[in-house]
Curated annotation (Swiss-Prot):
The keyword Metal-binding is annotated on this UniProt entry: no
CDD domains named among the record's database cross-references: DEADc_DDX18 (cd17942), SF2_C_DEAD (cd18787)
Species this chain originates from: Yarrowia lipolytica (strain CLIB 122 / E 150) (Yeast)
InterPro entries referenced in this protein's UniProt entry, alphabetically: DDX18/Has1_DEADc, DEAD/DEAH_box_helicase_dom, Helicase_ATP-bd, Helicase_C-like, P-loop_NTPase, RNA-helicase_DEAD-box_CS, RNA_helicase_DEAD_Q_motif, SPB4-like_CTE
Protein known as: ATP-dependent RNA helicase HAS1
């Protein structure tokens, strides 16, 4: 039988270099002409300043020269999203077609649920009755700060963590996101600095290490409020900040320092006036995330440099073998192991209603568009897998008068910070982002989490949905899956994640596909952005390590292209493997027309 028109198009789109990488494979070079971005009708790219309460972060929003911008993340470590540069290769493990591949994948995402052999184990009942902070011995200064911040009672994690930390114990904490662990480690740290009467000339007494800049900023904000009635000094050093200004402040003396790993190691090795010989406590927050994004070696170097006689606190939402290894070299023997989740039925928050929807690739954007239109008064976070996909969908939605904010790792630090705090302070709105916002960030009153692109593994799923239903609040989550991705559900079931299947009748989904395709074909800026987003989506998809679930060779590329507004898949190149090996040329018709400029357009229904 002859091929149908659709099958011919799909066959053409799947013209790839077969087998392992051909060193002589021709890789399409990106155009030398800079891509122009569609400007949203109501731009949110330029926010003049943060709220007054965050103006005290010296140098963070300086508009002058920023030394060595993104120096800390020269290898892309600080964010988990895929690199979207054509010339950058992506390390991909070859899929093992033999037996046992499923087992290897499950082991790579397995969570260790047993405590270290020498640890004293304390199980925490998440439904325990809350006790007031006044029941533990805290200074009047700290109690006043807690009152000013609106905190009167402790979460179960805080109740079990603060007393042993005040007593000087090393702690390994396994707590769900949203459990109140930031206060749990900051309160004892600040109390210790007060008790020892730290002054600027004494240098740094406490270091808090965070995986991402946004989480570091959030910890800094909480610490600043807690220290409002104390005399000790506070500082922050993160990638994207002005390094010279950071060093000047370190030279003056920072008693409590919040940081990201790469920038901390830089200052430890190169800032001569940085006094850390009096360090009394090291706090490693979101340790699993720090290791996942490639900072294992940096953390080992940091621990080698810092004084050995210190108290250490390590917190991690999931306990993996690498986290255990880090705990072994950073904690004293016989630490206190605090586990909130081990006996819980669910790995996610109790107030979270979560589900999934099965949707073909060509209907994904239509469903997202319809969902956002129907929930215009809600506060929603949409997770995507790559920077360029976030960029495209952000531009597209703003262009068609559906206002959204976007956040990803390719943005300058000032833009990321402004967007982050703008969304925090918003009562409603949509944030489209990569996993840069998936860990630890306390964004209030989020109604919905939409996982538009599926997460890499159950841990990523748990951290994404952890942005809603925080504390005692409620929230909802929905994950988009194609029929070929349903195998991911068994991984979630094994991780004790309860999901319901949602159904959306076709009549409730706005049929704007033809208008979308006309817009993308006629607008050069959106067409270029859509092509970049399409390529980035495929490259991110190829990078998934659950190869039996996410199989790029089984993607219907015609349908995938339609979700980016293309009638025919555009010609793109994705690099799979090291040094350009395994480059795949995914071909299609490059059908953009350079006409149409920035402006606003509405889809009619």
């Amino acid at each position: 039988m002859g091929l149908t028109k659709k099958e011919k198009v799909e066959k053409k789109a799947r013209s790839v270099v077969k087998g392992k990488a051909d060193k002589k494979a021709k890789v399409e070079k990106p155009s030398s002409k800079p891509a122009k971005s569609a400007k949203p009708s109501k731009s949110k790219d330029e926010v003049d300043e943060l709220d007054d309460e965050f103006d005290e972060v010296e140098g963070l929003l300086e508009k002058g020269d920023v030394e060595e911008e993104d120096e800390e993340e020269t290898n892309g470590n600080e964010d988990s999203e895929m690199s979207d540069d054509d010339e950058k290769d992506v390390e991909i493990e070859e899929e093992d077609d033999g037996e046992g591949s499923d087992l290897e994948e499950e082991e790579s995402t397995a969570v260790v649920t047993t405590a270290p052999a020498d640890a004293e184990v304390v199980h925490i009942a998440s439904d325990a009755e809350r006790k007031p902070f006044s029941t533990i011995p805290l200074s009047e200064n700290t109690m006043q700060s807690l009152k000013d911040m609106g905190f009167e009672t402790m979460t179960p994690v805080q109740e079990k963590t603060i007393p042993p930390l005040l007593a000087g114990r090393d702690v390994l904490g396994a707590a769900k996101t949203g459990s109140g662990k930031t206060l749990a480690f900051l309160i004892p740290a600040i109390e210790m600095l007060r008790k020892l009467k730290f002054k600027p000339r004494n240098g740094t007494g406490v270091i808090v290490v965070s995986p991402t800049r946004e989480l570091a900023l959030q910890i800094y904000g909480v610490a600043r409020d807690l220290m409002a009635n104390h005399s000790q000094t506070l500082g922050i050093v993160i990638g994207g900040n002005n390094r010279r200004q950071e060093e000047e402040k370190l030279n003056k003396g920072v008693n409590l320092l919040v940081c990201t790993p790469g920038r901390l190691l830089d200052h430890l090795q190169n800032s001569q006036g940085f006094v850390f010989k009096n360090l009394k406590a090291l706090i490693i927050d979101e340790a699993d995330r720090i290791l996942e994004i490639g900072f294992e070696q940096e953390m080992k170097e940091i621990i080698k440099i810092l004084p050995k006689e210190r108290q250490s606190m390590l917190f991690s939402a999931t306990q993996t073998t690498k986290v255990e290894d880090l705990a072994r070299i950073s904690l004293k023997k016989g630490p206190l192991y605090l586990n909130v989740d081990e006996h819980n039925v669910s790995s996610t928050a109790e107030g979270l209603e979560q589900g999934y929807v099965v949707c073909d690739s060509d209907k994904r954007f239509l469903l997202l568009f319809s969902f956002l239109k129907r929930n215009a008064g809600k506060k929603i976070i949409v997770f995507l897998s790559s920077c360029n996909s976030v960029k495209f969908y952000g531009e597209l939605l703003n262009y068609i008068d559906l206002p959204v904010l976007d956040l990803h790792g390719k943005q300058k630090q000032q833009k990321r910070t402004n967007t982050f705090f703008e969304f925090i302070n918003a009562k409603q709105g949509v944030l489209i982002c990569t996993d840069v916002a998936a860990r630890g960030l306390d964004i209030p009153k989020v109604d919905w989490i939409i996982q538009f692109d599926p997460p890499d593994d159950p841990r990523d799923y748990i951290h994404r949905v952890g942005r809603t239903a925080r504390g005692s609040a409620s929230g909802k989550s929905i994950m988009f899956l194609t029929p070929s991705e349903l195998g991911f559900l068994r991984y979630l079931k094994a991780a004790k994640v309860p999901l319901n299947e949602y159904e959306f009748p076709n009549k409730k989904i706005a049929n704007v596909q033809s208008q979308l395709e006309k817009l993308i074909s006629s607008n050069y800026w959106l067409n270029t952005s859509a092509k970049d987003g399409y390529r980035a989506y495929l490259q991110a998809y190829a990078s998934h390590h659950l190869k039996t679930v996410y199989q790029i060779d089984k993607l219907d590329l015609v349908k995938v292209a339609k979700s980016f507004g293309f009638n025919v898949p555009p010609k793109v190149n994705i690099s799979i493997g090291a040094s350009g090996k395994g480059a795949k040329s995914i071909k299609g018709k490059d059908n953009h027309k350079k006409r149409g400029g920035p402006g606003g357009k509405k889809f009619t229904r």
